[in-house]
Amino acid sequence: MSSASPLRVLSIAHTAVSRAAGRLRYHPLAKRADLDVHLVAPTRWHQFGRTSEADPPDDPGITMHALPVWFQHARPVSWYLHVYPTLRRIMREVKPDVVHLWEEPWSLVALQACLLKGDAPLVLEVDQNILKRLPPPFEAIRKFVLRRTDHILARSPDAAAVVRAKGYRGRISYIGYGVDEATFRPAAQPQPTAKRPLQLGYVGRLVADKGLDDALDAMARAHSAVRLAIMGEGPYEPALRERATQLGLVDRVSFQGWGTPAEVARFIQNLDALILLTRATPTTLEQFGRVIVEAQSCGVPVIGAATGAIPSVIGAGGWVVPERDPRALAQLLDTIAPDSEARRLRGAAGRKNVAARFTYEAIAKDLADAWLEARASAADRHQDAPYRSLSQPSPHR
């Protein structure tokens, strides 16, 4: 690559099957003359019981390659078992200067990319934040991939600690999930606060680990009038409905299914605070909490549990309560229910948090910085190699 040529990057991400979920963060990169970005995503993806067709390309500045995948129905581990049978052809056509993977290092597609990338440096984006030994062959794949990775983009300090513990010694920087500010923005008309119950909301899967039981218990303990609106689907919904009935909260808790991004934004705009009370378990730990930044982008503060990445993502834009502690949550609800000014200030702080860390422009810059750094470091190593070899004694002497 000459100094005048743009850096050719091949980014591989199954999430990019969806424009809203995975592609918008790449859009700011199309304006950069120093980058030539090629994005690989599946033509079709199966996740959480749903099959999604790849959205059509919508940004002429990014070259989209929608490729068929194998093993996409190997749930619940399809994220780690899928491969692209035509990836070798794309590698030969693009001849990338840098390969970027938005996949975990033990995935088969990470192994595939390592075997096909040639001398191109590898940038790897990781979410996994629980240190554990993986079953064969995944532990061996992780070790193989990390040894050949030039730069890690970690979602959280816990995720960085995991790759360090597994032997990675290279450069690490941090990257969040971006938020679509055009969709997730403050309501045009602020919600009236006088004589209105405190309106809490939750968006996500309905499973026991999300801690919604703690929210219901806290509502029953609190002296203030509190309502909870739940948007999402999952196997734990019947148990939540039963618990709400047992606590006498049926008329204060509402359920609705998944919505489009625009519907999620309108749902959040009607809240006084969003809750994310995820519980840590031996197998799960909140890796980021994208709904946190969606709420903050709407100017809505967040109440989160002190677990996983939740506190670091919330920042000053909300409150953090102890995990699995309905009493502490009830006390917080009684404190903020009558204090609309405190909620407004935390909401404003959340907007600043998003502007500084989680806009798509910020995420795109984090990506570009990592790609350019990896390429520069690789070039330095190649330039230094002849001098290192001359300085080392010959094994035949």
Question: PLM ranges: what are they?
Answer:
Residues 1-68, 120, 396-397:
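N-terminal subdomain of nucleotide-sugar transferases
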Residues 10, 192-221, 229:
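Conserved donor-binding/catalytic core segment of Leloir-type glycosyltransferases
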Residues 15-18, 104-108, 120-138, 148-151:
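A short, histidine- and acid-enriched strand-loop-helix "catalytic/donor-clamping" loop
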Residues 41, 131, 139-187, 195, ...:
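Donor nucleotide-sugar binding/catalytic pocket of nucleotide-sugar-dependent glycosyltransferases
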Residues 241-262, 273:
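Nucleotide-activated donor-binding/catalytic signature segment of Leloir-type glycosyltransferases, i.e.
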